[in-house]
Amino acid sequence: MLSYFQGFVPIHTIFYSVFHPTEGSKIKYEFPPNNLKNHGINFNTFKNYIIPKPILCHKLITFKYGTYRIVCYPVTINSPIYARNFFSFNFVFVFPYDCETSPYEPAITRLGKMFKVLEEQNQLLSKSERDPVFFDLKVLENSTTTPSTAGPSSTPNPSSNTTPTHPTSEKDTKDMRSSRYSDLIKDLGLPQSAFSIQDLLMRIFQDLNNYSECLIPIDEGNAVDIKIFPLLRPPTTCVSLEDVPLSSVNLKKIIDVNWDPTMMSIVPYIDGLNSIAKISKLSNSDPGLVIECIRHLIYYKCVTLSDIFQFSNIYAPSSLIRNFLTDPLMASDCQSYVTFPEVSKISNLPLNKSLGSGDQDSPSFSVRRKSKSSSIPSNPDSRTTSFSSTSRVSQNSSLNSSFSSIYKDWRQSQTSCSSSNIHVINNRNRFLPTRSCLFDLYRSLSQGQTLKTWYESKYMILKENNIDIRRFITFGLEKRIIYRCYSFPVMINAGSREPKEMTPIITKDLVNNDKLLEKRNHNHLLSATGSRNTAQSGNLKPERPSKVSFEMQRVSSLATGKSTMPKLSDEEEGILEESIRNAETFDKICVLLSKPKLEVESYLNELGEFKVINS
């Protein structure tokens, strides 16, 4: 089955074969005329497969003859009105052997089934032959040849003037058969058919080869309606709420008013960043319907699926990474796809957004926030005084607005990546990263480190080469040169108690986390006053990496010094427990609960001891 559409192969020949009661299997009509003979196709060598035994009838038959592929759907109709109590016919299509005929096969099957019904209803095909030899006229013949005068002896009297009722010449026989055929048509109550099989074959051949569809009327109520569709590989059934659809075409340009309403409502939110769950929420659509729409888009190669981009993800190179070196087109596509636009400011964001108020002298900020230097006092002495709680909140708000502005610009630039496989950007005053650089970056990914750790170690390389890390990861996943290691939470004592006996989750202050946040805040403030080495604050990392998020709630919580965990509802508790029993990934659990990974881990700690399995 095709993985992508390559076009329809033209039909070489189409012919109509029928079983003649006295001559056997024969070709009645073909188009183009004499095309079989001109190309050395001998019908007698395979006629037993065209009009086969009853066991092979009403089945699609495909076989090879020389350099040709023959596809047909033989039909046999049993009825006492026919000369041999049956009528067999077949519409046969001939193609070049080295081609894909699967798009034609459903149409050929439907064509045979349709004419089977038409023949059963009004003898459409048999009457079009204009030959009474196809019908059983024995009864009529016997009734005609019966003497009109009854008597004990059946021997004709030579002296009698009675005219014999049996035909005396070949002409009389032909006239009698024609008369009986007309009587048969009259007895059946059916009009004479003006249907032409030869004309039908010609129009099917020309229309399918030229337009891949045909609409040929047969009578007032029937028509041959065929449209050829490409048969592509069916989409995966493993489409989940946490998957992120990436459009490979501009969906807004191909959208049609006749599309499904759900499909039209979700198209504006397919930007390469939103998960299916978020698309469902933003479009106010049922998640099940959204998944079905995404599967349709996947089938027609308009959308591919990716994971939610998170710095807590773990990626590693696959065995197909060698294709990056052997396929020059892949490398060149990667070079142009993974680079930032020249005006992008996303690289100015710090690695840890919870870091202090923006020390200009800090190494972790100097290369990322040059554009922000004007908003920070240039005199170090002016920052030697301790900050009050109010000034911290004010400075965090300023930092929040800066982050939001940069992230908004970055998100708008990222949505363009889902409209084309190759990112077309402004090439003025910009150099593409080398292929060896990109290969080394892909090769350096490993299962032993999160994406955040990898990004911190490769930050300067990514910045100097103007590489967008999200595009970099997305391209590797699409080309299958890297793969992701998924994380599954597993409760250690999950099998020892029933779900209803699990410890209820209560509202609780995260004392340890608050202390950790207060410690970070204190260190950052000391760093801002110049009394603490900035390298110490830069080395602080959370115990567990969480998914990347540019929300400012974390920074605001630093100012208050406390954070609380809201209690899960009964429905959310059931979702969490069921997800654990079903061995769902952290991504899906976070999406189902609409909570970040750090909070989900805290809820899991309340349920009991658990471990994380990476696979």
Curated annotation (Swiss-Prot):
GO cellular component labels:
GATOR1 complex; Seh1-associated complex; vacuolar membrane
One GO BP on record is: response to xenobiotic stimulus
Where in the cell? Vacuole membrane
Keywords, comma-separated and alphabetical:
Membrane, Phosphoprotein, Protein transport, Transcription, Transcription regulation, Transport, Vacuole
Q: What happens when the gene is disrupted?
A: TORC1 abnormally activated in presence of rapamycin.
| Entry keyword Transcription | yes
- For bias type Low complexity, the affected ranges are 143-167, 373-398
Q: What induces it?
A: By urea and proline.
Q: Which residues carry this modification: Phosphoserine?
A: 362
Q: How does it sit in the membrane?
A: Peripheral membrane protein
Question: Which top-level group of life is the source organism from?
Answer: Eukaryota
Biased composition (Polar residues) is annotated at 527-539
**Where is the stretch described as Disordered?**
143-176, 354-398, 527-551
UniProt keyword Acetylation, yes or no: no
Give a short account of what the protein does. Answer: Component of the SEA complex which coats the vacuolar membrane and is involved in intracellular trafficking, autophagy, response to nitrogen starvation, and amino acid biogenesis. Mediates inactivation of the TORC1 complex in response to amino acid starvation. Post-transcriptional regulator of nitrogen permeases. May be involved in putative NPR1-dependent phosphorylation of nitrogen permeases or in the processing and targeting of nitrogen permeases at the level of the endoplasmic reticulum.
Misc. remarks from the entry: Present with 319 molecules/cell in log phase SD medium.
Q: Which family does it belong to?
A: Belongs to the NPR2 family.
The subunit structure is: Component of the SEA complex composed of at least IML1/SEA1, RTC1/SEA2, MTC5/SEA3, NPR2, NPR3, SEA4, SEC13 and SEH1. Forms a heterodimer with NPR3.
Its recorded name reads: Nitrogen permease regulator 2
